[in-house]
Amino acid sequence: MTERFEVTTGIQKALSMKSEVFGMLLDGTPSEPSISKESVHHLSKIVSGKPLVRPAWFLDTNQQGEGIVDVTTHLVDLVQWEAFPGQIIDRSDIKIISSKRWTTSLAPDQFKNITGLDSYPEYLQKDVKSDTLNIYCNGEINYTIKGKHAKVSVIWDYKAPEGTGDTHHSVMRGSKSDLIIKQGEAENYKPTLYVISKEGENFESNLEKALESIQGEYPGIEADKISDSKWKILIPEVLKIGHEAHFGQVTDNFLKYYKDGQLPVWEVPNMITKYYTTTQAYKKALKK
């Protein structure tokens, strides 16, 4: 799971484990979940300086799967990994409240730009209406995990506005602070972690101590005070290695587990629960 190695996510998790800064994870509500993850992706994009050519089957949900059971897998994984670190999560700990799925539409010229093909293959005809390809690549899941309200959503647009790219938005709500990752225009479309305090007294010094305690893993990080209750976490560029490099880190982790001959005790049961969450949400969304 590559996003476990994204530096802002790692620091968000680390700070959520500092009770003097974060407090306890709130129970949340469906409208204001205790933890939420949203990612926006684009079918047409530039990767490593070159236009990405996707195979046509990538747009066939019978072969690729729908969005609600695809990228959401990563987001559900992060919810489990951050909210309940090192804990075994059983399927009985999951309650699906609501879920939905919807399409992204592609015109023939957009399809050609993505795949290089002049026409839709036969296996995509089932999703074509009035010459427009409609793909169920978007999904949203509202659920509880061990009694805490969570929400994950994935959106696939055709193409990002000029100068932007895929984005990630994440919120963890605690009794003492909220930990929020934003990646919008104000952040120059770069993942940025904010800490928003709910308590005034000693919070700043507690935050500084917490950051000092994780310098070994995240050397050079600092807190930039924006207001009396809001800080931006400054992260050295050397720690921002980029999404493609995370695949190497995942591989290193796998090879370590392979050498040791075992995974962490929580990894396999949580993997089962992760896929249970996405598939149950998919089944629920199909009933609408």
Where in this protein do the model-derived segments appear?
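C-terminal helical cap and adjacent loop that interface with cofactors, partners, or active-site loops
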Residues: 70, 75-80, 87, 92, ...
